[in-house]
């Protein structure tokens, strides 16, 4: 459950219910995000929304609570092309997560290798303009 606060920050449900359905062994949460913590991993100035902090520890606790074995962590648009929160989560996952990064067209081979070494296996293309572009086209 997500709730919009009066300050424009999206707040997360503090106590999600355990689902009645049990995922099969080895099940993967195939699309999830880490958000911040903003003091360590600031949100992009051009972001279209501001989430409450929901870092790697919260994500991994939710994964375990829901009964998933692994995650595919997708770079959140609120972090723009700064993949540090994603990479931090991947490195802390003990091999239980892979990532999808957002990159600039001029990314270097060395930067791509660093993302790969952290566990990134895909690139996110943002075609939904409402997530990344203030002006509808």
PLM feature segments, named:
Residues 2-81:
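An N-terminally biased module of ancient metal coordination in phosphate/nucleic-acid-related enzymes
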Residues 2-11, 80-137:
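Active-site gating/metal-coordination segments in enzymes
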């Amino acid at each position: 459950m997500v709730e919009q606060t009066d300050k424009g920050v999206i707040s997360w449900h503090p106590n999600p219910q355990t689902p009645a359905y049990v995922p099969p062994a080895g099940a993967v949460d195939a699309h999830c995000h880490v958000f911040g913590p903003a003091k360590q991993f600031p949100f992009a100035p051009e972001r279209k929304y501001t989430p409450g902090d929901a870092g790697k520890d919260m994500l991994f606790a939710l994964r375990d609570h829901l009964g998933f074995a692994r995650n595919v962590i997708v770079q959140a648009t609120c972090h723009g092309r700064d993949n540090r929160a994603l990479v931090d989560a991947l490195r802390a996952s003990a091999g239980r997560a892979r990532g999808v990064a957002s990159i600039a067209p001029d990314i270097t081979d060395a930067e791509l290798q660093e993302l790969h070494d952290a566990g990134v296996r895909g690139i996110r293309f943002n075609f939904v303009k409402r997530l990344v572009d203030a002006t509808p086209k």
